[in-house]
Regions:
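Unchanged
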Residues: 1-253, 358, 362-364
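Left-handed beta-helix
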Residues: 1-4, 199, 206-368
Length: 368
């Protein structure tokens, strides 16, 4: 592969409520046995990119623990491999990252010491499967300075006002780019995936940062007169930017067509856990549910996603909910439209009920 990778994994969001108090968005557990970053990291490896940097910032401990061994993504290599960059203070720098452009600039030695001609930049906070080598070839064929991957969401329920919105002219060349516009001119949203020449990226960063320009979209994409093209992606994609989007993403994988992302090659890799298979006792009734290994089910579970080592007691009902690792649902409980974080205990006969529009969130380690 003629490119190196950069995964931006430093984000946090108040819209995720208690779910982000103890972890970065990129470390969010999704779909029974994965973390959000597994998707972008697997995409890198599966696309032939063998040198990848993960740039972290907020609540990075669990993320660094998850990435402690690069071998699961075939990135334990003598040449290339997996790099994890965190903010650091020095005599020359006493700031945290002040924007995406700044986070890359503070690790510019990674770019300068590489020899590959291109860089693929993406977020570690979205769930999707993509072959970046196809985007790179498109970028080369267009002789583009920068290629942005986008998706047309006119046939979805996504609110375009939450994203960067773009319009394109002849040959799919970028005409306008607005971040979270009040009056959107199209339904083409940026997926935060970029391809750019390594030397050009270095030049743009070295011009921008000393002037106090730290934002990647505003200060790198829009402020410079460069040839930018769009690459349309029509596969499944969702980002974890709110409680509702987190719930939606997990529920989407109850659909077998979406689940093909996980069951068809190339596979999405993750840090494994050596647990026994899930156990379904005689009183269990499970319908349209993903159940993680090591779980024990005595009650009724419907339209839900259960992570590893979840216990559901006899007579309990779990419906339209996400139950994270090592949580305990007592006998006779009713859990509906809820997101239960890790290591939560719901005592016998308790009710935790939200709505489809506003799922209730129970933070990590709580006892109800």
């Amino acid at each position: 592969m003629r490119a190196i990778g950069i995964i931006l994994a430093g984000g946090n969001s108040e819209r995720l409520k208690d779910l982000c108090k103890v972890r970065a968005i990129a470390a969010m557990p999704v779909v029974s046995s994965y973390r959000a970053i597994d998707f972008s990291l697997s995409n890198m490896s599966n696309s032939g990119i063998k040198k990848v940097a993960v740039i972290t910032q907020f609540n990075s401990r669990s993320l660094q623990d998850h990435l402690s061994s690069a071998k699961w993504w075939e990135l334990d290599r003598k040449e290339g491999g997996l790099y994890i960059f965190t903010p650091f203070l020095s005599s020359d720098n006493n700031f945290w990252f002040r924007g995406i452009a700044d986070s890359i600039y503070q690790n510019i030695s990674y770019l300068k010491r590489s020899h590959e001609p291109y860089v693929v930049i993406c977020s570690g906070e979205a769930v999707y499967k993509m072959d970046y080598s196809e985007v790179l070839q498109y970028h080369i064929d267009k002789a583009a300075d920068l290629t942005i991957v986008y998706k047309n969401v006119s046939r979805t329920n996504k609110d375009v006002h939450d994203y960067g919105v773009m319009t394109f002219g002849e040959n799919n060349k970028l005409e306008t780019f607005e971040e979270k516009p009040i009056d959107a001119k199209s339904s083409n949203i940026s997926l935060g995936i970029y391809v750019i020449k390594r030397t050009l990226l270095i030049k743009l960063l070295e011009n921008a940062i000393p002037k106090g320009y730290y934002d990647f979209v505003k200060d790198i994409i829009l402020r410079n007169k460069i040839d930018i093209y769009g690459y349309e992606f029509d596969g499944y994609w969702n980002t974890l930017n709110s409680v509702n989007s987190y719930m939606e993403t997990n529920m989407d994988f109850l659909n077998k067509d979406v689940r093909k992302i996980l069951t068809q090659e190339p596979f999405i890799a993750s840090k494994p856990s050596d647990d026994p298979p899930a156990k379904y006792n005689p009183t269990a009734e499970v319908t349209n549910t993903l159940v993680g290994t090591g779980s024990i089910i005595d009650g009724n579970v419907k339209n839900s996603v259960l992570f590893r080592k979840v216990f559901v007691g006899e007579g309990a009902t779990v419906e339209n909910s996400v139950i994270m690792k090592s949580s305990y649902i007592g006998k006779g409980c009713v859990i509906k439209n809820a997101i239960i974080d890790k290591e939560v205990v719901i005592s016998d006969n308790k009710e935790v009920i939200g709505t489809e529009e506003e799922p209730i969130v129970i933070g990590k380690g709580q006892v109800i």
